[in-house]
């Protein structure tokens, strides 16, 4: 059977108090609406339509990579009106449509799939996603007749018996497309708010003796975000889910409450993560690594057996058995080899560092190719920028760079060379050479006495 989905993402979200449309606020590094789109995709629903309104162009910009279509709700007149705006998307289609909100990022793909499967297997015209909660105050109650849904009653309209019902409407649905389109034509905005409500479709279907069912899920999954506090709550739940998955897969997380891992991160078993680490994007971390406190790793590949201390690694690759930090900064497009030492207060920018090379402290390497088994003394600077352009430096294997050396790019240092401490290198250093480029020391005896500087 054909399946499609509609995601409601047109509202501004005034209570979140932001210039940014509500659905574009991030939970664990990903926009809420993209969490929902990805849940649809992972539930094997490829045809997804996003209802846009406030900040429409920005929402399109942030979701376009997910290959979705869009329907515009220029004026926000309720959930029923939002779905009516997707009429062009639905017309000509057969099968079922899942309808979810773009501000409920905790929904799981398996829940979406189960809802759709339940709807199809029970041959329903509509199937609601519901939850059972201890305190349902403020929520619409699900009134059942056996297994089927009889009606949804808003809290303020509940009678003495209905007020005791703990099953609530989550605001997420699966509909038979033909039944939905027919019912949408009958929707009325004859209410205090002057809006069209999707819940009224259920009443219309029941009047036509159509079958309406419901599937209960964990209330946590259905949580929507209307404020910064609710966003923080949702992110906390999501972070706990992510961390629990890694724990179950053999990763040690010393303090899960203070470890921040985004959903697409992959971590190998027997890796140990201390508190304060932030691991973002599509980072892949190998096995047997140790991430000591307070590092940030973004969109990077970390090999096996790597140790990282209080450092920042962005869009780069770190080889096996390498150590980084403390307080190192590995900038984008850097490729650090195996068994390398990147020490304290070292900055690497868009450079390749060969295996077994040591850059132990207080060094800047930018736009460089560094060979294997090199050693950089403290205070080395690759001077890659002339004020207008960046230039490249090449350093061969087995080179020793003395302390306080400046390598003025573009320049090449051949294999097996030594550069004396304090040198400023502006020309090629031949293989097997010692390069000394500093002023000759001159001692002027009696100078202090004569100048009376004591």
Curated annotation (Swiss-Prot):
Reactions that this protein is recorded to catalyse:
alpha-D-glucosamine 1-phosphate + acetyl-CoA = N-acetyl-alpha-D-glucosamine 1-phosphate + CoA + H(+); N-acetyl-alpha-D-glucosamine 1-phosphate + UTP + H(+) = UDP-N-acetyl-alpha-D-glucosamine + diphosphate
Kindly list the GO CC terms recorded for this protein. cytoplasm; membrane
Q: Name one GO molecular function term.
A: magnesium ion binding
Region (N-acetyltransferase): which ranges?
Answer: 250-454
Keywords of the record:
Acyltransferase, Cell shape, Cell wall biogenesis/degradation, Cytoplasm, Magnesium, Metal-binding, Multifunctional enzyme, Nucleotidyltransferase, Peptidoglycan synthesis, Repeat, Transferase
According to its UniProt entry, the function of this protein is described as: Catalyzes the last two sequential reactions in the de novo biosynthetic pathway for UDP-N-acetylglucosamine (UDP-GlcNAc). The C-terminal domain catalyzes the transfer of acetyl group from acetyl coenzyme A to glucosamine-1-phosphate (GlcN-1-P) to produce N-acetylglucosamine-1-phosphate (GlcNAc-1-P), which is converted into UDP-GlcNAc by the transfer of uridine 5-monophosphate (from uridine 5-triphosphate), a reaction catalyzed by the N-terminal domain.
PANTHER family per record = BIFUNCTIONAL PROTEIN GLMU, NUCLEOTIDYL TRANSFERASE
Q: Which family does it belong to?
A: In the N-terminal section; belongs to the N-acetylglucosamine-1-phosphate uridyltransferase family.
Name assigned to this protein: Bifunctional protein GlmU
Q: Which organism is it from?
A: Clostridium perfringens (strain ATCC 13124 / DSM 756 / JCM 1290 / NCIMB 6125 / NCTC 8237 / Type A)
